[in-house]
Regions:
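A structural signal for short secondary-structure junctions
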Residues: 365-366, 376-377, 439-441, 464-466, ...
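Short, compositionally biased
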Residues: 486-487, 507-521
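Long, charged amphipathic helices and adjacent flexible linkers at domain junctions
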Residues: 419-446, 516-521
Length: 521
């Protein structure tokens, strides 16, 4: 109850303290994400150096395969030691935000950094961005635990850390902010917003001091696509929506494939993608690791459609195989690479058929990255901001928005569940779904009241609030209103609720239904 009393007595002080908490989280999450990014960058460089050295030396090829098997065994042991470090890491953070999971922050940090580095050194088709989100969140959780912050502040700081991790991974602070709100929280208040912004900006500042000011993708967009050609974007959006739904289906089937290997202990299954990676090293090395080599191929060379299609299909199934094993690594960057290749193939065909200038090919590549991301993750605003920041220009905002909206609708109509929600559901099922064990802790959460929601224009006492929560205050603009039974709730208010942490996930979902906008059928 101490945190509630503090908030009621000094709500502005609570918000101000969150700014400094965000700065602190941004420093530590940014440093950890930068270290992780440096390790993975150097691991990838070392990988291609090893391939170049061994490819004409059979003896050293055999030695390299032995090393790959050993690395697979080490990673497998790490994942058995700390299971929450497997996979992307984003579903685990979502689960903790909802109160379903309680990760061991220092074990996750150690196993994720070591395991992720070994996976990239081994050539597995995994990304650094999802792990960076988890590393940032765990760094924030560690700070909150060490400094003995309240449960409410710990959740805020973890959300901030997750965004800061993404900001450092992509040099994209706005995308980091929006990802935290759109994908992790689903709603927000001003206190949370300033905390996340301060963390993401601080983290991005640290990242840019190490990696420079250049965007992650150095695309040179000559001109925006003329409005007369927007029919091409409609078709592209439909294609990306279909491909995004198929991507989600295959990624989950990849997990099913490894899950069916009942006779092989889980810690040994990760060896399989390392062995397959060894074969890929000497047959199609461009699809190894995150995919930076693939991007340079379509931006610096003119490839045949058949060549791009081969690389696309190979990268797609190799990524599904690697991710399905439970290896510590994400799908964030690889899916952007796949989106880029879908755009390159589509753009090449459209340019050949319509005769529009060839420099529009880069437009199709960048737009497709955002559209494919949106179809898979179902976070359109994050997708638009991420690609805009990564390419260093906001001139193509309209075309990005058109494709993202269409791909979102197509994937939704196909009833394709957002990938991270599907993965979280599997994690909860695997762990027997245990709510947080901290039954004596209470957490303050904010819920925005939507226009036309159940709560709008109702008295507090007339709403069937779920058990295990207490409505504390209503934030209406800059005004802080003590919630009483006779208090009327307005659309646009932010309801502050005190929730038993043992029932956080269930209560949060119930209040979101009450406060969310009702969409007519």
């Amino acid at each position: 109850m101490k945190q509630m009393k503090s908030l009621l007595e000094n709500p502005h002080g609570f918000s101000v303290s969150l700014v400094f908490d965000g700065l602190l989280v941004g420093i530590f999450a940014g440093c950890i994400s930068v270290i992780y990014r440096l390790l993975l960058n150097n691991a990838e460089k070392l990988l291609f150096t090893i391939i170049a050295f061994t490819k004409t030396r059979p003896f050293w090829i055999a030695v390299w395969f032995i090393v790959l098997i050993i690395m697979g065994l080490i990673v497998g042991w790490l994942m058995s030691w700390e299971g929450m470090a497997s996979g992307s890491g984003i579903p685990q953070v979502q689960g903790e935000m909802k109160g379903y999971l309680n990760q061991n922050w220092h074990r996750v940090l150690c196993s994720k950094i070591i395991g992720g580095t070994l996976c990239i050194l081994g050539g597995l088709s995994l990304g650094r961005e999802g792990p960076s989100v988890q590393l940032g969140a765990m760094a924030a959780k560690g700070i909150a635990k060490i400094t003995k912050r309240s449960q409410t502040k710990e959740r805020y700081m973890m959300t901030c850390g997750a965004g800061a991790g993404l900001a450092a991974a992509f040099n994209a602070p706005l995308a980091g902010v929006m990802f935290s709100l759109e994908e992790l929280q689903k709603n927000f208040n001003s206190s949370m917003l300033v905390c996340i912004i301060s963390g993401c900006v601080t983290s991005d500042f640290i990242s840019k001091n190490v990696f420079g000011l250049s965007p992650v993708f150095d695309f040179h967009l000559k001109a925006a696509l003329p409005l007369v050609h927007y029919w091409m974007l409609i078709l592209l959006g439909i294609l990306l929506g279909l491909c995004g739904a198929f991507y989600n289906f295959i990624m989950l089937k990849g997990q099913d494939l490894f899950g069916a290997m009942k006779k092989i202990p889980a810690k040994y299954r990760i060896v399989f993608p390392f062995v397959v990676s060894g074969i890929v090293c000497y047959t199609l090395p461009s699809i190894l690791a995150g995919g930076h080599a693939m991007i340079s191929l379509i931006t610096g060379h003119t490839l045949l459609v058949s060549t791009m299609l081969l690389l696309l299909v190979a990268k797609f199934f190799f990524s599904a195989f690697c991710f399905g094993s439970g290896a510590p690594g994400g799908i964030f960057f690889p899916l952007l690479i796949l989106g880029a290749y879908l755009g390159a193939i589509y753009g090449t065909l459209v340019i050949q058929a319509s005769g529009i200038p060839s420099y529009y090919l880069v437009n199709f590549i960048t737009i497709s990255m955002a559209g494919f991301f949106t179809a898979i993750v179902r976070a359109p605003i994050t997708g638009i901001l991420l690609i805009a920041e990564m390419t260093g220009t906001f001139e193509h905002f309209l075309s990005l928005a058109v494709v993202c909206i269409i791909s979102y609708l197509v994937a939704h109509l196909l009833k394709s569940e957002p990938i991270y929600e599907s993965l979280l559901g599997r994690i909860l099922a695997k762990n027997g779904f245990k709510e947080s064990e901290d039954a004596d802790h209470k957490v303050l959460r904010g819920f925005a009241v939507g226009t036309g929601s159940i709560a709008a224009k109702q008295l507090v006492k007339d709403i069937p609030w779920p058990e295990h929560c207490l409505i504390v205050t209503l934030n209406r603009g800059d005004e802080e209103i003590i919630a009483r039974g006779s208090t009327e709730i307005h659309a646009g208010d932010t309801i502050i609720a005190l929730i038993d942490d043992n029932y956080l996930g269930m209560v949060t979902e119930s209040i979101q239904l009450i406060c969310g906008e009702i969409i007519p059928e």
